[in-house]
Regions:
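Acidic-leaning, charged glycine-interspersed low-complexity segments
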Residues: 81-129
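Predominantly extracellular/luminal cell-surface or secreted proteins
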Residues: 22-23, 62, 79
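Oligomerization/assembly interface segments of phage tail-like spikes and tubes
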Residues: 51-67, 76, 117-128
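Small/polar-rich, solvent-exposed N-terminal microdomains that initiate assembly or binding
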Residues: 1-49, 83-95
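Short hydrophobic/aromatic patches at helix-to-coil boundaries
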Residues: 2, 128-132
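Short acidic, gly/pro-rich beta-turn/loop elements at beta-sheet edges
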Residues: 46-47, 69, 132
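Mid-chain, well-packed structural core segment of small domains
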Residues: 65-89
Length: 132
């Protein structure tokens, strides 16, 4: 589902998967200006509705310029905020996901481990129903 979400972000922003938009990737040290979609904590699964779950994700925007990092974080926020009953793009032969997304506004985390890139975080929850 995270790959499909990245495709949705790519379709609705200027970011490109694998270039400056990454899913669950920590091998992005060489890329200064990028968005990383991470899954930092477990989500919720309904015992009765087995095809539905809530997945907490975070979009990290990183840049050598603090204002660029903030602008990039808000670009993802604007693409995702208020999504309701949207089908994510199918990647490969995967299932169809119908989702609702609730976002928090991006906030400044500080500098990354290299001490030269500003990082903004935007937490969001994806409420997903597997349609196939």
């Amino acid at each position: 589902m995270i790959k499909e979400l990245c495709e949705y972000i790519e379709d609705n922003t200027d970011f490109t998967v694998g270039t400056d938009l990454f899913a669950l990737s920590e091998d992005t040290d060489s890329v200064d200006d990028c968005i990383i979609i991470a899954e930092p904590s477990p989500g919720l699964a309904d015992a009765l509705l087995t095809d539905t779950r809530q997945v907490p994700l975070v979009a990290y925007a990183r840049s050598t310029d603090k204002h660029t990092a903030r602008t990039n974080a808000y670009a993802v926020f604007d693409a995702l905020h208020g999504i309701f009953q949207v089908s994510l793009p199918v990647v490969g032969s995967g299932p169809i996901y119908l989702c609702n997304i609730s976002c928090s506004t991006p906030y400044y985390l500080g500098l990354d481990e290299s001490e030269r890139r500003a990082v903004y975080a935007m937490p969001f929850d994806v409420h997903v129903t597997n349609m196939l």
